């Protein structure tokens, strides 16, 4: 029964809710309209009521949470309608997990955006995929601009995202960062996507983390059981840090150093927590984490097998290293304040 409950949480976390396939809505939608981030409804309603009371912020970008869907005229659409309550509910499962991780130490802000659908990723990185993703990024850029100008109020901040959200974080660092804003960037956590050498060479704000305390860096990794779990989307990836021991070489991080693997329910409550269960070591050939202590069968999500085959732990990456990541956010925040003042 416990295993069954965890599997349910996994599906909620990644938002692979099969009822989203082909849903129709009761009114006309137009996903071509840019989202309005002056409207509070365009933002996730935080579980934490004391927004802006902490010393640092996190700007979080959700992963892919919806499938292709039809509007009331029968048109098949490939981007989220952020005003659709069922689609918002699908996104919230992933956002609740992220808020639980980042929100204990930071003010938590997460925009709803016209993210692309699961099916759109089968086209990556072709022109049609890019057209759809450009719609998503136009929202993210607008939301980030509004956040910096009207919400941040000069505080240090963290950028974070998983999967599609990680890709969006990477693109924000490429296109929407400047020196003044970068001075306040504690770190970025684009987890669950790839970064190639050309991107690193051509973008000065894409700086891979080397330890647990460096600042203005990107903390990125992808988790698999072995080569069988490698995703085609990880091709040419060059960035990986081990979130258990914060090494970038092949030093093995045994499970005793894992502070806690945590699974969260849709209401933010902890469904299960276990310290010392997951170990990991970087494989330098592919720049991914090889994970020990997790079952490929248990965490397999067949709905995304073409993107992430059995043996990939893409869905569980926040969960597996939850307490280590949570502590690292605090450690880097303290490091930022110690170096600035």
Regions flagged by a language model, labelled:
Residues 58-60, 108-112, 159, 187-190, ...:
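A structural signal for short, well-ordered beta-strand segments and their strand-loop junctions
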Residues 136-153, 174-322, 326-331, 335, ...:
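Surface cap/lid and interfacial helix-loop subdomains adjacent to catalytic sites
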Residues 161-165, 169:
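Gly/Ala-rich beta-loop-alpha elbow adjacent to hydrolase catalytic centers
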